[in-house]
C-alpha cells in the first residue's frame, strides 16, 4: 500500500469510530430531592432504558415539599435518565422562567448531558464520551499495521 492509501484508511477509521454508538445502555447518576450533590447522588448509578438517551440534573433552591415564600430554604438535587426531548423541554422551561439563582426566591435549573455518567457534577456541561477507548485501540492498531506495510529504505 502507498502512504496516501494508508492515510485514507486511517482517516476513514477515525471517522467511523466517531460515528459508532455502542449497544450498551447509557449510565447516569440518579437521585431524587437530595439536600446536596453528595452520597446518593454520587454513588447511585442506573443503566437507562433504551429510549433514554441523556442524563438530566436538576438543582432547586427552596423549601420542601412545595416552594413557599418565607419558609426555610436549601438546595435540592435530582438526577435521572431522560429522553433528549424531555430534558430540553424542562431546561427551556426552567432556564427562561425559574433559573434565577436569587437567594431569597425559590428557583430551579436543569442541565442535560450525553455520555456515561456525565451528570456527576450538578451543572456539569461534561463532554460526551462515546467509545473513545475502542477507537484509540483501533487507531493504534492501524498505525502499527501502516508502519509495518510501509517499505523501509
Curated annotation (Swiss-Prot):
Query: Mainly localized where?
Result: membrane
What's one GO-annotated cellular component?
Answer: side of membrane
Tagged with keyword Disulfide bond: yes
Further facts: The name coiled reflects the excessively long and convoluted tracheal dorsal trunk phenotype of mutant larvae.
Give start-end ranges for the coiled-coil region(s).
none
Q: Which residues form the signal peptide?
A: 1-25
Name its cellular compartments: Endosome membrane; Endoplasmic reticulum membrane; Cell membrane; Cell junction, Septate junction
Glycan attachment residues as annotated in the record: 33
The protein's name is UPAR/Ly6 domain-containing protein cold
Q: How is it modified after translation?
A: GPI-anchored.
Q: Which cysteines does the record link by disulfide bonds?
A: 28-55, 31-41, 48-81, 87-112, 99-109, 113-118
Supply the InterPro entries for this chain: Snake_toxin-like_sf (IPR045860)
Mutant phenotype after disruption: Embryonic lethal. Aberrant tracheal dorsal trunk development resulting in tracheal tube size defects. Compromised epithelial paracellular barrier function in trachea due to reduced and irregular septate junction formation. Compromised barrier function between the hemolymph and central nervous system (the insect blood-brain barrier).
Amino acid at each position: 500500500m502507498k502512504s496516501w492509501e494508508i492515510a485514507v484508511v486511517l482517516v476513514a477509521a477515525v471517522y467511523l469510530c466517531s460515528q459508532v454508538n455502542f449497544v450498551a445502555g447509557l449510565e447516569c447518576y440518579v437521585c431524587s430531592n437530595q439536600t446536596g450533590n453528595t452520597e446518593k447522588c454520587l454513588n447511585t448509578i442506573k443503566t437507562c432504558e433504551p429510549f433514554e438517551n441523556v442524563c438530566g440534573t436538576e438543582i432547586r433552591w427552596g423549601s420542601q415539599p412545595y416552594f413557599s415564600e418565607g419558609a426555610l430554604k436549601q438546595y435540592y438535587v435530582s438526577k435521572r435518565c431522560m429522553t433528549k426531548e424531555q430534558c430540553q423541554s424542562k431546561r427551556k422551561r426552567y432556564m427562561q422562567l425559574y433559573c434565577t439563582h436569587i437567594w431569597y426566591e425559590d428557583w430551579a435549573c436543569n442541565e442535560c448531558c450525553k455520555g456515561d455518567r456525565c451528570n456527576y457534577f450538578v451543572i456539569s456541561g461534561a463532554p460526551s464520551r462515546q467509545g473513545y477507548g475502542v477507537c484509540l485501540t483501533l487507531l493504534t492498531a492501524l498505525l502499527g499495521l501502516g508502519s509495518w506495510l510501509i517499505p523501509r529504505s
